[in-house]
Amino acid sequence: MEQDVTMYQGFADTYDRLMDEIPYDAWHAYILELLRENQIEDGIVVDLACGTGAMTSRLAADGYDVIGIDLSAEMLEAARDKCPDSVLLLQQDMCELDLYGTARAFVCVCDGMNYLTELEMLRQTFEKVFLFLDQDGVFLFDMKTAYFYEHCLGDQTITDNREDVSLIWENAYDKETGLNEYLLTIFAMVDEERQLFERTEEYHVQRAYPLQDIMELLQQCGFQADVYEACTKETPSAETERAYFVAHKRPA
């Protein structure tokens, strides 16, 4: 089962400018803390759905041998500009992950897992990660919750108007299916002298899952897992907007 390869094509060039409020520094500090708690201070770390390389580049600066994986060639091009040459960037579908060896850890931030809109897609990804993860390795990922989609996004239209780029984000959330659909319309300046802007549109779909369903699926795939409120060690509440899963591959 494959993901949609068309997402983040027109968005890649402007993603970092429009998403400059994403708290990557806080997420990175949390991820680094979890890695070190699990005695992973060096070696190979795989960044799934790495996008433009915001987390990838930070982990590389920490001294890890980082592999960044994303479905979008355009996002990987942006990541190449941001990451040192030592970082290996691969265009792959997470559901069909294929590596030459194992890694000490896998990470996936900024709701990359929410793009897997069927449980079977998540199962395939979890099984692949388990296969390529070292014994005693750790799989760290976040997911947005149903509460976030329903109460923070909902059926809103969000606009962001900058000097050289503008965004219209039309959002629609279906509580019954857990599917969150959004249409992005981007106007990006292509000629400053003539004030010419190029319009592109992208359609994205994410899905919210009950946290317990994810925990059970991780266990079915062989992991021992915990789930926390984002950037804490607290148990998620009914109003948690983003949860972090910490999944271990333990010897049988």
Give, region by region, the residue ranges found by the protein language model.
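A short acidic, Gly/Pro-enriched loop at the edge of an enzyme's catalytic core
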Residues: 98-105
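Class I SAM-dependent methyltransferase SAM/SAH-binding core
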Residues: 46, 53-96
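Residues lining the SAM
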Residues: 109-111
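Conserved class I S-adenosyl-L-methionine
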Residues: 1-41
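C-terminal lobe and adjacent flexible extensions of AdoMet/dcAdoMet transferase-like proteins
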Residues: 207-252
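SAM-dependent methyltransferase
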Residues: 140-215
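A short glycine-rich, Lys/Arg-flanked "PGG" loop and its adjoining helix->strand segment in the class I
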Residues: 123-135
